[in-house]
Amino acid sequence: ISRSIKHRNAKLMLPCPIHLDLVVTMRALSSRNTQSNIVLRNEIDKIRLLFRKDRESYLCFYRILGFYPHNIQLYEQALLHKSTSVRSDKGRPLNNERLEFLGDAILDAIVGDIVYKRFEGKREGFLTNTRSKIVQRETLNKLAVEIGLDKLIKYSTRSSSHNSYMYGNAFEAFIGAIYLDQGY
């Protein structure tokens, strides 16, 4: 069985079927645009995934994100509630609070940009109130549940430090992880 592939006005006959991902990768290699680089990066990450011991974690995050994480520890940390007793190599508590701080700032900036462009001519007070309503904890809690973060958060059932905003906080931390992992 042979498969015919057209590439830049040339016709290549291959003696056996090839995996479509290889075709996508080759097209990305031949192009220099940003979208192609993203496709290529994702294809390379898929290949690396085959050799990882923590494949399931990567696949889980891929289902949520639509791309493979480069630094999976960031995403795992984003899902560690402060009630866990996990410690870093240096003995410091390891949780999602710092990533939450970063994610909160990023969400404010992104939503602020969208609101600014969407409501041209509106005054600052209106823009601030609109942004605040969009990034409020109840909304972030719902978003976290919609994408399935609520099932992945690690927390201590013995601690009384749970709050009704745990999911929204994890969502913000997840945004912070994406920002650090994918660049800015």
Q: Where are the regions a protein language model picked out?
A:
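Nucleic-acid processing machinery
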Residues: M13
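Short, low-complexity, intrinsically disordered N-terminal modules
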Residues: I1-K6
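Short hydrophobic alpha-helical segments enriched in small aliphatic residues
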Residues: R8-A10
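RNase III-family endoribonuclease catalytic core
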Residues: H19, V23, R27-Y184
